Structure formats: structure tokens, C-alpha cells
Amino acid sequence: MPEPVKVLVTGAAGQIAYSLLFGIAKGDVFGKDQPLILVLLDITPMMTVLEGVVMELQDCALPLLKEVIATDKEDVAFKDLDVAILVGSMPRREGMERKDLLKANVKIFKSQGAALNKYSKKSVKVIVVGNPANTNCLTALKSAPSIPKENFSCLTRLDHNRAKAQIALKLNVASDDVKNVIIWGNHSSTQYPDASHASVTLQGKDVGAFEAVKNDDWLKGGFITTVQQRGAAVIKARKLSSAMSAAKAICDHVRDIWFGTPEGQFVSMGVISDGNSYGVPEDLMYSFPLTIKNKTWKIVEGLCINDFSREKMDITAKELQDEKETAFEFLSSE
């Protein structure tokens, strides 16, 4: 058996983690023969709840799970990690300005970035889920200068999966038959879900999404707004934010980092924008279409960007620049 992979999940007493931990522990992410050490971090008031989560993981009697470490201390949580999945963040409370939310989270992710820098392996893969995910990820990256920038990514796979599902529902096909949708930009309501490079398998043949759907107005209108606002729609209906679908997206995201993307397919992830060929400003965590091989991602090059797409891509880049400026003001005053 290979050496255990050491994986941290933060916000481990929360509802996303509750759906996520079982998937990781039973081998859905790192493979069915890869032993694991799970490290669960949460804030001190959540430690009793976390004990219950540990009991349940023990009671699952999972053969791959070699050890579970529950802690409220960063020096314990970040020690010698292979993978860090940063789910925990300050949630937006009613009446809270986005600026206040950014300020609270800059503090958290600055501290966690510094802990990654100090205690984790330099090869650690860091996945940020806690919102605002892109800017939280950039904050952690800036606070961990000894870890390569390329090791940081943030979750836009939930948006990617939502986009696939919407096209599949529209055409009454399996979501696996929809390939190469793209989420550009921020994991927020300015994101740009782009179907212009997507294909759909119909009767064994791959057809462009626009040709398959035969409804350009929907693909340039209702499809985009549905994906952009899906998180809010789930909260309105369920009175809680997406957890099961978020956990599934995290599993997809990390599994693709670990094992690579299938030939001819790309996925969406927020990564550092340095050196991109799509006119996105440098030094942002921006969601691009990527292929992954040997645990290394590459932005898909050469996709044609029409005026409609350009405008949408610029709007979300502008929001990310504004967020970054606000976050960095707080960072420098910390």
C-alpha cells in the first residue's frame, strides 16, 4: 500500500464538510487504494460538534482512513500536508457589506496562508472553497511565498457542473454528454458561464452546444443568469446554502488535480492569471478552462473570444480587481 496522503479540511464541523468528508474517506478523490490521514480544523466553539463528526467517521469503518486528527490549532492542522481544502470562512451575515465580509476573511486566509508557508510541505495543493473564494485564495497565496503559485486554486467547479446540468436538462441528455462548458472569472454573480466552446453528444455524435440547443437567446440569456444565480436559488428554497453539490464539486476538482483531466476535455478552476493569453489582468485568481496532467494545470489556449464573451469576461475581471484592492488594503493594515 502507498504512503498515506495527509489531507486537511477546514470548517470541518460545517455542512459542506459533512457531505465532503465521507466522499474523500471512502476513496472517491484519491483512489480506492490510497490510504488517508484526515485532519479536521474548526474554531474552538465547534470542537464538540467536530468530536461527533470524528465519531461518525470512525463508525463508517472505512479501510482507507488510517487516522483522523481534529483540532482548533493551525500549527497542528497545517503540519506536513499534501492537500489543504479550505472550506471554512466567515459567512455573510444579514446587513453585512461585501467589504466587511472581505475584511473578516482576509484575516482568516492571511493566517492560514502563513500556516501553510510555515508547516506544510512545499508541494501542498491548496484548494479554496470559502467565499469570496477567488480573493480568499489570492490572500492565502500572497501569505505563503515559499509555496508555488500554481499550487493554489479555488472552486468554480460547482458553477461548471451547474452549467453542464442546465444544458443537459434543456436537451434531456445525461450531464456526462455535455463537455467543455467554461466558467470565466469570479465565483460570484458576475461569473461568465460560456457555452460557446461546449459540445453535446447526440446520437453518438459530438455537436456544438449552440447547434444542439438551437436557442441562442437562452444560451446568451436565461442559461447564464440561471447559473449565476443558482446558489441564491438553492438558499431561497432550502434556507441553507448548497452543500451536497458543493461537496461533489470539491471532489471533482481535487480528483482532477490528482489524476488529470480526460483527453480532449477541460474543466474550470480559479487559478493565478499570470501569463494568460485572454487579456485578463495579471495577479488575479480568475477562473479559466484548464487541462491537467501530472498534477500540473495549463490554461487552454487559442479559444476564439467574441465581443459578447469579451464584455462578460471584463466585467468579472473588474470585480476581482476591486475585491483584490480592498483585500490588499486590509492586508497591509493588518
Curated annotation (Swiss-Prot):
Alphabetical list of InterPro entries matching this protein: L-lactate/malate_DH, Lactate/malate_DH_C, Lactate/malate_DH_N, Lactate_DH/Glyco_Ohase_4_C, Malate_DH_AS, Malate_DH_NAD-dep_euk, Malate_DH_type2, NAD(P)-bd_dom_sf
Catalytic activity: (S)-malate + NAD(+) = oxaloacetate + NADH + H(+); (S)-2-hydroxyglutarate + NAD(+) = 2-oxoglutarate + NADH + H(+)
Binding site for substrate: 92, 98, 131, 162
GO biological process entries: malate metabolic process; NADH metabolic process; oxaloacetate metabolic process; tricarboxylic acid cycle
GO cellular component: cytosol
Class in the EC hierarchy, top level: oxidoreductase
Major subcellular site: cytoplasm
This protein's record includes keyword Metal-binding: no
Keyword annotations of the record: Cytoplasm, NAD, Oxidoreductase, Tricarboxylic acid cycle
Localization annotation: Cytoplasm, Cytosol
Active-site residues, Swiss-Prot/TrEMBL: 187
Enzyme nomenclature, EC number: 1.1.1.37
Entry's Gene Ontology molecular function annotations: L-malate dehydrogenase (NAD+) activity
Record Pfam families: Ldh_1_C, Ldh_1_N
Sequence positions that bind NAD(+): 11-17, 105, 112, 129-131
SUBUNIT field: Homodimer.
Function: Catalyzes the reduction of aromatic alpha-keto acids in the presence of NADH. Plays essential roles in the malate-aspartate shuttle and the tricarboxylic acid cycle, important in mitochondrial NADH supply for oxidative phosphorylation. Catalyzes the reduction of 2-oxoglutarate to 2-hydroxyglutarate, leading to elevated reactive oxygen species (ROS).
Protein family membership: Belongs to the LDH/MDH superfamily. MDH type 2 family.
Listed name of the protein: Malate dehydrogenase, cytoplasmic
Gene label: mdh1
